[in-house]
């Protein structure tokens, strides 16, 4: 199980790297799907299945819509590939930042934060999964509204960034 969780963590980092250094929106979708599946699987391994399911639906339901719009509006005749020097430079830079973070985190890692697991106190403990459901629907209404507005803002930002110098979705008619 430990190796599987480490594999999910590696897939999450590689998917995030693929989203951060994507040469065209086509490849960004692949990185986003890989990172969201790995991150939600990581949460699932901690026992927080409802939060994992909600995040998976938000990522794939909300953000893939943004990428579909951007792919349809930024139809490049010759998109850059992963092997281009600019993309490789971004990848090497991000891996260098990750390594520096791991080295610094190794020195700071002696603080021993830890993770609370499910059912650690016996029959009388409340699972993190079910308390999360109650918090989502009682105190989390404002955060759902903020997340919805954030996704709408992200849609417009990506549509503006994708259009570049050519025509885009938001243009003067």
From Swiss-Prot:
EC number(s) reported in the record: 7.1.1.2
Catalytic class of the enzyme: translocase
Catalytic function, reaction form: a ubiquinone + NADH + 5 H(+)(in) = a ubiquinol + NAD(+) + 4 H(+)(out)
Pfam families attached to this UniProt entry: Oxidored_q3 (PF00499)
TM region(s), chain numbering: 1-21, 27-47, 48-68, 87-107, 139-159
Annotated membrane topology: Multi-pass membrane protein
Positions of disulphide bridges: none
Alphabetical keyword list: Electron transport, Membrane, Mitochondrion, NAD, Respiratory chain, Translocase, Transmembrane, Transmembrane helix, Transport, Ubiquinone
Its job: Core subunit of the mitochondrial membrane respiratory chain NADH dehydrogenase (Complex I) that is believed to belong to the minimal assembly required for catalysis. Complex I functions in the transfer of electrons from NADH to the respiratory chain. The immediate electron acceptor for the enzyme is believed to be ubiquinone.
Protein name per UniProt: NADH-ubiquinone oxidoreductase chain 6
Phylogenetic lineage: Eukaryota, Metazoa, Chordata, Craniata, Vertebrata
Encoding gene (name): MT-ND6
